[in-house]
Structures are given as structure tokens and as C-alpha cells.
């Protein structure tokens, strides 16, 4: 016997769309935009890590991150 929870009842409408395909491109353009933004975020983090992005008056070192 399955346990019914409030969270399960809230998530049930999401599961009712299982297996259905949105017509046309659906949300693909939105996904592409978020992937591009995530790539930009990763590039900025990498540049900060490599110190190739110059941040004035901000000392970034592992010793300052320690507690």
C-alpha cells in the first residue's frame, strides 16, 4: 500500500504529463538560453580562478578563504 503525502499530491499534476510531447519546439529555446547563461557563468568562474579576470581591490587566494 502506497503512502499518500501532501508533497505527492502537489507533484501529481507534473507526473500526469509523462510521455507527452509538446508540439513544435516546445521549451527548447528557453533551455538553450539557460545553457548559454550557464556557460557564461562557468567561463567567469574559470577566469576568476585563473586570475585572468582582473578584479581590482579584491584579493583572491586560498589562505583568505580559510576559517
UniProtKB/Swiss-Prot annotation:
UniProt xrefs under InterPro entries: PSII_PsbH (IPR001056), PSII_PsbH_sf (IPR036863)
Domain of life: Eukaryota
GO molecular function: phosphate ion binding
GO process annotations (BP): photosynthesis; protein stabilization
Membrane-spanning residues: 29-49
Keywords: Chloroplast, Membrane, Photosynthesis, Photosystem II, Plastid, Thylakoid, Transmembrane, Transmembrane helix
Gene3D superfamilies cross-referenced by the UniProt entry: Photosystem II reaction center protein H
Compartment(s) where it occurs, according to its Swiss-Prot or TrEMBL record: Plastid, Chloroplast thylakoid membrane
Disulphide-bridged cysteine pairs: none
Subunit structure as annotated in this protein's UniProt entry: PSII is composed of 1 copy each of membrane proteins PsbA, PsbB, PsbC, PsbD, PsbE, PsbF, PsbH, PsbI, PsbJ, PsbK, PsbL, PsbM, PsbT, PsbY, PsbZ, Psb30/Ycf12, at least 3 peripheral proteins of the oxygen-evolving complex and a large number of cofactors. It forms dimeric complexes.
Function, as annotated: One of the components of the core complex of photosystem II (PSII), required for its stability and/or assembly. PSII is a light-driven water:plastoquinone oxidoreductase that uses light energy to abstract electrons from H(2)O, generating O(2) and a proton gradient subsequently used for ATP formation. It consists of a core antenna complex that captures photons, and an electron transfer chain that converts photonic excitation into a charge separation.
Entry similarity comment: Belongs to the PsbH family.
Name by which UniProt lists this protein: Photosystem II reaction center protein H
Name of the encoding gene: psbH
